């Protein structure tokens, strides 16, 4: 389990997170949602170990602040919002960085190709990363973090920490990525994902944490937290859960692809 208690984070003298309590259990997908500037990315960066914090964060019972980077890399893999490479690399070289940083089938020379196939990039290993589209690059980075924790449980649960993993993707690849997250959780690992699409959140998350103004204001199953009044207040616009739009306006739900 990943557990944060009374988490406080300041950046540049400004308080970003205030007294946040957070838990992500293995075996489920935990989604973090909320408006821009609510602290979602700061929260996932903090539980990843990328930001200094006040309070307590434990990873499978170990205090994160006391873990060496190599120890943390064995247990969790992090997909940031964006990654810039300033030197030319092939896709395979980028994905292979995950094997170097974490112990996961390290003797499997075909692991990068297997990870690329999983994210629908079979045949891309020899291409240059800089020549890919933004969405393709995002999936290459996901393949990298999958290599790092390829086995979801090695004596203890391992975790995928995903910051907006579908932000640059078309709907087909959004569904592929979130199915990967569900499969990882079903195999005993844990997933924490920052998401903006509330429909995708309802479709794939087991547990939802709602952030607002640097605080965790709600947590529970999608059915428990997706309530009209709460969402309207947090997102500062009138929202109705499950209400059809007026008139003949067409709309799509990702759930139709899951039948």
UniProtKB/Swiss-Prot annotation:
As for subcellular location, the record says: Cell inner membrane
Q: Tell me what topology the record assigns in the membrane.
A: Peripheral membrane protein
Binding of ATP: at which residues? 34-41
Q: Which GO terms describe its molecular function?
A: ATP binding; ATP hydrolysis activity
Q: Which domain of life is it from?
A: Bacteria
Q: Name one GO cellular component term.
A: plasma membrane
Q: Does the keyword Membrane apply?
A: yes
Please describe the quaternary structure of this protein: The complex is composed of two ATP-binding proteins (HmuV), two transmembrane proteins (HmuU) and a solute-binding protein (HmuT).
Upper taxonomic lineage: Bacteria, Pseudomonadati, Pseudomonadota, Alphaproteobacteria, Hyphomicrobiales
Under Gene3D superfamilies, the record lists:
P-loop containing nucleotide triphosphate hydrolases (3.40.50.300)
- What SMART domains does the record tag this protein with? AAA
Homology family: Belongs to the ABC transporter superfamily. Heme (hemin) importer (TC 3.A.1.14.5) family.
Q: What class of enzyme is it?
A: translocase
The free-text function statement in the UniProt record for this protein reads:
Part of the ABC transporter complex HmuTUV involved in hemin import. Responsible for energy coupling to the transport system.
The protein's organism comes out as: Chelativorans sp. (strain BNC1)
Q: Which residues form the signal peptide?
A: none
The reply on keyword Cell membrane is: yes
The record ties this protein, via SUPFAM superfamilies, to:
P-loop containing nucleoside triphosphate hydrolases
EC identifiers of the protein: 7.6.2.-
What is this protein identified as?
Answer: Hemin import ATP-binding protein HmuV
Could you tell me which InterPro entries the record lists for this protein? AAA+_ATPase, ABC_transporter-like_ATP-bd, ABC_transporter-like_CS, P-loop_NTPase
Every copy of the ABC transporter domain together lies at 2-238
Which keywords has UniProt assigned to this entry? ATP-binding, Cell inner membrane, Cell membrane, Membrane, Nucleotide-binding, Translocase, Transport
């Amino acid at each position: 389990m990943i557990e944060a208690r009374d988490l406080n984070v300041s950046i540049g003298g400004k308080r970003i997170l205030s007294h946040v309590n957070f838990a992500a259990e293995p075996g489920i997908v935990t989604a973090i949602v909320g408006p821009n500037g609510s602290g979602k990315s700061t929260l996932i960066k903090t539980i990843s170990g990328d930001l200094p914090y006040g309070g307590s964060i434990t990873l499978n019972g170990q205090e994160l602040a006391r873990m060496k980077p190599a120890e943390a890399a064995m247990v969790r893999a992090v997909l940031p919002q964006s990654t810039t490479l300033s030197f030319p690399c092939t896709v395979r070289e980028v994905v292979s960085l995950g094997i170097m940083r974490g112990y996961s089938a390290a003797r499997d020379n075909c692991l990068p190709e297997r990870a690329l196939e999983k994210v629908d990039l079979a045949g891309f290993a020899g291409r240059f990363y800089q020549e890919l589209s933004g969405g393709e690059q995002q999936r290459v980075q996901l393949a990298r973090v999958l290599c790092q924790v390829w086995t979801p449980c090695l004596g203890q649960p391992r975790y995928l920490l995903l910051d907006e993993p579908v932000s640059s993707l078309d709907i087909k690849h959004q569904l592929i990525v979130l199915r990967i997250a569900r499969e990882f959780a079903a195999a005993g690992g844990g997933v924490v994902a920052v998401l903006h699409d509330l429909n995708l959140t309802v479709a794939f998350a087991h547990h939802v944490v709602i952030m607002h103004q640097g605080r965790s204001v709600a947590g529970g199953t999608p059915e428990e937290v997706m309530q009209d009044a709460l969402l309207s207040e947090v997102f500062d616009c009138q929202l109705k859960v499950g209400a059809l739009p007026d008139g003949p306006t067409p709309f799509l739900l990702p759930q139709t692809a899951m039948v």
